[in-house]
Amino acid sequence: MKLAYWMYAGPAHIGTLRVASSFKNVHAIMHAPLGDDYFNVMRSMLERERDFTPVTASIVDRHVLARGSQEKVIENITRKDKEENPDLIILTPTCTSSILQEDLQNFVNRAGLDSKSDVILADVNHYRVNELQAADRTLEQIIRFYLEKARSQSNEPLRKTEKPSANILGIFTLGFHNQHDCRELKRLLTDLGIVINQILPEGGSVTNINELPKAWFNLIPYREVGLMAANYLKNEYDMPYVAVTPMGLLDTENCIREIVDIVKSSDTSYNFDFETYIDTQTRFISQAAWFSRSIDCQNLTGKKAVVFGDATHAASITKILAREMGIRVSCSGTYCKHDADWFREQVDGFCDEVLITDDHTQVADMIARIEPAAIFGTQMERHIGKRLDIPCGVISAPVHIQNFPLGFRPFLGYEGTNQISDLVYNSFTLGMEDHLLEIFGGHDTKEVITKSLSTDSDLAWAPEALTELQRIPGFVRGKIKRNTEKFAREKNCNLITLEIMFAAKEAVGA
């Protein structure tokens, strides 16, 4: 546990609550002190939904600490069972309330005797895993619970659907453009002649989980949530799964090919002409292939970019920038430290360096050092970009309200390629735009940022040196500032004056 004013992935209980509140008619009870119960406010603020967040906080206060939690927790479970009539009540502690080391499983067993609902305790180690790992584990736990329950109650043989069908696992609340991606995935599968069997957890019902094994395969669009459930279904029911994220033209094609291979292995009469479909979608429906050959996109060739986000989105955007748009990715990184090996393997050869960290100050210093033409990251990278005057396109959670758009903006599938192309192109400062603004927009009043974003900088700029720096055109100012600071460090100077600026200029032969 550490104190931070910014976290990329939240504590474990947030992941459990995100999964629980994505299902229909599932209620979550959070055993937590005041201060840990911000999930309701966060979800109500960000998600474009009319429903109340189905989460109740069972507050740990001084009375609970004096008498124990059993009475209060059981009372909250039975009360919500009578008030809401949910199909499932899931109890989760937080990392703070876990310190009490209470036997919550015993509380759940006791409450389950008097409840019509199913009651389970989230099986998550709150000290070892983060929000995304906990969400993945909770989804797998709920699916396992209901499938084992159905198996114990019925011995009927499993029957697959007549037509090719798929489950989509991992679409859930507060995800990055998850609702839009889900619509695009439905369209893609429908085009391939594949029926949607179940979508979990978003909008799904736990009473239908026993229908999951009827599908021919599972589609996992995001690595962060759904892989554990897919592996469980593969091991127990021999269900294949596709974990290629269909983001960008090449990976969408790879995803379609994997789906077709799975369907053909089960049904030899399936003769969908996917080659023609891919060709038509790539050439006429998606504008990305045409755009990447246009003069507008060619102007971006060789420009430097930095990518940072969750493993799925950061890896996919890195490959799109490098393979499909010819943009140089100076650094690609992720905050999913638990998936570092997979991430390195995916971006190998597509970027100059890789950064695996959940410390935003390291990301900020890396961006300040590289000075890219554009950043593609999370809400935090947007803030960093504003401080450094570098444009940023948001490509990954965590994000704020402006990245929960009302309009249709998927990142997956062929429509997603159009959205990504727009985002990439609009994120770069175009041509002479910056210079023309200085010429026709009066004096350049932008403050020159002279420090790195961490607190360990050892250089200061004299006022006259800053004034001279502001006279330099914007498109070379950053390079000159960087060279001057490098020269000052070599000469062990803590204050950069005009004399040092001119000496640095002579030293680099300018």
From Swiss-Prot:
Positions bound to substrate: 431-432
Listed Pfam families: Oxidored_nitro, PCP_red
UniProt cross-references to CDD domains, sorted A to Z: Pchlide_reductase_B
Name of the top EC class for this enzyme: oxidoreductase
Top-level taxonomic group: Eukaryota
CC annotations in GO: chloroplast
Cofactor needs: [4Fe-4S] cluster
Active site per UniProt: 296 (proton donor)
Family to which this protein belongs: Belongs to the ChlB/BchB/BchZ family.
Role: Component of the dark-operative protochlorophyllide reductase (DPOR) that uses Mg-ATP and reduced ferredoxin to reduce ring D of protochlorophyllide (Pchlide) to form chlorophyllide a (Chlide). This reaction is light-independent. The NB-protein (ChlN-ChlB) is the catalytic component of the complex.
Oligomer status and interactors: Protochlorophyllide reductase is composed of three subunits; ChlL, ChlN and ChlB. Forms a heterotetramer of two ChlB and two ChlN subunits.
Protein name: Light-independent protochlorophyllide reductase subunit B
Species this protein is from: Chlorella vulgaris (Green alga)
